[in-house]
Curated annotation (Swiss-Prot):
NCBIfam families given in the database record: PRK09303.1
Role, per record: Member of the two-component regulatory system SasA/RpaA involved in genome-wide circadian gene expression. One of several clock output pathways. Participates in the Kai clock protein complex, the main circadian regulator in cyanobacteria, via its interaction with KaiC. KaiC enhances the autophosphorylation activity of SasA, which then transfers its phosphate group to RpaA to activate it. In addition to its output function, recruits fold-shifted KaiB (KaiB(fs)) to KaiC to cooperatively form the KaiB(6):KaiC(6) complex (independent of SasA kinase activity).
Keywords for this protein: ATP-binding, Biological rhythms, Kinase, Nucleotide-binding, Phosphoprotein, Transferase, Two-component regulatory system
InterPro entries the record matches: HATPase_C_sf, His_kinase_dom, HisK_dim/P_dom, HisK_dim/P_sf, KaiB_domain, Kinase_SasA, Sig_transdc_His_kin-like_C, Thioredoxin-like_sf
Enzyme Commission code: 2.7.13.3
GO function term, MF aspect, one: phosphorelay sensor kinase activity
Gene3D superfamilies per record: 1.10.287.130, Glutaredoxin, Histidine kinase-like ATPase, C-terminal domain
Protein name per the record: Adaptive-response sensory kinase SasA
Native species: Synechococcus sp. (strain JA-3-3Ab) (Cyanobacteria bacterium Yellowstone A-Prime)
Complex formation: Homooligomerizes. Interacts with KaiC. Participates in the KaiABC clock complex, whose core is composed of a KaiC homohexamer, 6 KaiB and up to 6 KaiA dimers. SasA and KaiB(fs) compete to bind to KaiC.
Disulfide bond residue pairs: none
Amino acid sequence: MQTSLDRTSTRSGIRLLLFAQGRANIEELAEQLRRHIQGLPGQHPAHLKVVPLEEHPYLAEHYKLVVTPALVKAEPLPAQVLAGEDLATQLEVWWPRWQGQAALVSYQEEAGQDPAPPPTTEALLQMSEEVFSLRQERAQLREQLDFKDRVLAMLVHDLRSPLTATALAVETLQQGREGSLDKAVERQLFEHARQQLRKMDSMITDILESARGSASELRIRAVETQLASLCQPVIEELLPRIQAKQLQFQADIPVDLPTVHVDPDKIRQVIFNLLDNAIKYTPAGGSIRLNILHRTSQKVQVTVSDTGPGIPEAEQENIFSDAVRLSRDQQQEGYGIGLSLCRRIVRAHYGQIWVESILGKGSSFHFTLPVYRLCGR
């Protein structure tokens, strides 16, 4: 007597499927059943296949499984389900009948009496995998559509403030066309309007960039995530370097911070990169701060601040561009590529990233992430 896990379909044999939860448990049970089957009499081989229940829910529905572990005799038809703890004893009881069914199928094949065979077990397994994959893709697409709806709502909310400020500046300029405003005030209003327009342009650009597929290129897998739990391993990993430079480090992460909708690995990479740069550029005895705040009902803001040399104002606009290196960085490793990747990751999460810096005093890198909300809430 032999058992097999190969994919060749022999309809005169006995095709068995073992369903259980947890790979470790199911493999141990499968090995016990293999040894038991080898001791049973019969001319028709048994092909035993392990089927993790969580990976084949459709197949479990097909065989109407209620209790696991379960052993399904899938072929010869009709299918039969054995369930419970003592599968070996039940198998021994039904084994003679299954051998008889296999013998009948073998006779029919030899006599040419079976012109239209039903789908094989392997075909059912493949269909189960495809259905499960389609269900996962449909759920992911639905989640992406819901998420993009929330992003549009966030964009409208964020655009309202600079749009209002621009409108007020233009209205004031229009009212002062008859000379009631002096030139200095006019220049200030024009500059304010230009700044707000640039801010709106940046917001729209971020959304358009993410819509071009940066999320799919980076393979973002967004889930509900606790930022505090995500940050802790990063801090622990970098702590020896912080202590080696005698830097003062402070993390301010509120306990009531809402969960965010992010890819944990990607956002961990962003936080690590920003903290790594802060350690690299902050002189010994300086300070670094990680701060997270609930900015609005829809956003969380993460800030990494340092007391390093700062970034020249003229170079702040391009600091997140691909492979941009500041004049101060020629002796340092990396930097430009890391910040470029940070921007791509944050944009793929429909967030924004920017820097505020004063030369000679330090820098603060900020980025926003979407708050996790259940659909319909």
